[in-house]
């Protein structure tokens, strides 16, 4: 456990950020999962709507620093490719 005042503050900030980042990452995974369900059911209209939402959430997650921007680009590219194949 941290002893110095600044180290205690850092530990507190890290915990708050960890919780926030986990929430963002979970939201991203849930949106991707819903898109994959739409792809599996072969409903193109639903998949396109959910792709738009997924791209938005993935880009936001990357801009917040939760995931790397290249990882975000790769996820978007792969999801777009699957939706376009419908």
Swiss-Prot record:
Residues 1-27 are annotated as: Disordered. It comes from the Bacteria. GO terms for cellular component: cytosol; small ribosomal subunit. One of its GO terms (biological process) is translation. Residues 1-11 have a biased composition (Basic residues). The keyword Repeat does not apply. InterPro entries: Ribosomal_bS20, Ribosomal_bS20_sf. GO terms for molecular function: small ribosomal subunit rRNA binding; structural constituent of ribosome. Pfam families: Ribosomal_S20p. Keywords: Ribonucleoprotein, Ribosomal protein, RNA-binding, rRNA-binding. Belongs to the bacterial ribosomal protein bS20 family. Binds directly to 16S ribosomal RNA. This is Small ribosomal subunit protein bS20.
């Amino acid at each position: 456990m941290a002893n110095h005042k600044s180290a205690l503050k850092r530990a507190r900030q890290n915990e708050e950020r960890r919780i926030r980042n986990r929430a963002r990452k979970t939201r991203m995974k849930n949106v991707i999962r819903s898109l994959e369900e739409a792809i599996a059911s072969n409903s193109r209209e639903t998949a396109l709507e959910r792709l738009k939402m997924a791209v938005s959430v993935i880009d936001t997650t990357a801009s917040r620093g939760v995931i790397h921007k290249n990882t975000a680009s790769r996820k978007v590219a792969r999801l777009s490719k699957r939706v376009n194949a419908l």
